[in-house]
């Protein structure tokens, strides 16, 4: 949790919301208030957990702070079926993977021909993809996603 006091941020949150929905493609992986994808963190209250500087860093250098629960995995089953996606859980003998189509696969490790854990983010860097102004607007939008104090 960022835990610090709220700060004023530059940028236009309304423009940031449009970027989130459209050009950024964020909804394919991230969820806000129950709408969106499952393969990335839920951003419903991201403004409570990240500072504006952290949000910007997450957008331009997504590999810097990837938590293990967001690691990905590529496997090939002994029947030749390849599967790649988010590593949902992994034990000594089994692994479960959520693929890009939100299908959950479960494998016994002894049945895998190949297995590779990928400890980088599946999120692309938006450095060079979004302008500085667009990044500022997107950060303003994301930083405004906070817990409803009345709820």
Q: Which stretches of residues belong to each language-model region?
A:
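C-terminal capping alpha-helices of c-type cytochrome domains
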Residues: 1-4, 9, 60, 81-83, ...
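Accessory interdomain/linker segments of ATP-dependent helicases and helicase-like nucleic-acid enzymes
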Residues: 3, 32-35
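Sequence/structural segment immediately N-terminal to covalent heme-attachment motifs in c-type
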Residues: 8-32
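Solvent-exposed, polar/charged alpha-helical surfaces in well-ordered, non-transmembrane soluble domains
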Residues: 14-18, 53, 57, 133-136, ...
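Short, solvent-exposed loop/turn and secondary-structure capping segments
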Residues: 31, 39-42, 150-151
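Gly/Gly-Pro-rich "capping" loops immediately C-terminal to redox-active cysteine motifs
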Residues: 35-61, 71-125
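Active-site phosphate-binding and catalytic loops of NTP-dependent enzymes
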Residues: 65-68
């Amino acid at each position: 949790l960022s835990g610090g006091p709220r700060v004023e941020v530059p940028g236009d949150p309304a423009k940031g919301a449009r970027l989130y929905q459209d050009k950024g493609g964020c909804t394919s992986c991230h969820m806000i208030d129950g709408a969106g994808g499952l393969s990335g963190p839920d951003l419903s209250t991201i403004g409570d957990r990240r500072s504006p500087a952290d949000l910007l860093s997450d957008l331009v250098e997504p590999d810097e702070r990837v938590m293990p629960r967001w690691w990905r995995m590529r496997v090939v089953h002994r029947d030749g079926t390849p599967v790649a996606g988010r590593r949902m859980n992994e034990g000594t003998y089994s692994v479960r993977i959520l693929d890009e189509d939100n299908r959950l696969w479960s494998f016994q490790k002894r049945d895998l021909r190949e297995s590779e854990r990928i400890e980088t983010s599946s999120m692309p860097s938006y450095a060079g993809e979004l302008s500085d102004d667009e990044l500022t607007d997107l950060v303003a939008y994301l930083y405004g996603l906070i817990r409803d104090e009345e709820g």
